[in-house]
From Swiss-Prot:
Belongs to the eukaryotic ribosomal protein eL43 family. Pfam families: Ribosomal_L37ae. One of its GO terms (molecular function) is zinc ion binding. This is Large ribosomal subunit protein eL43. Transmembrane segments: none annotated.
Amino acid sequence: MAKRTKKVGIVGKYGTRYGASIRKQIKKMEVSQHSKYFCEFCGKYGVKRKAVGIWGCKDCGKVKAGGAYTMNTASAVTVRSHTIRRLREQIEG
């Protein structure tokens, strides 16, 4: 198997094709989609991507919907923080 260089990492499989800037964008996506994420249910780093937008924990078996390349999208994080703030205000006042 061919050795990838330190610089290009996971996108070394594309060689010199497609241009440098596109390979940099693809590297960011592929690194995030292949990494493990923290499971909110069991508290371990065991969540991996199963398919586009489907993330599953190997430890507790929970399946969660998320983004295509990352587990949490920016809009989902915003909605969640607003919801938590609204619920906290309802409890307090």
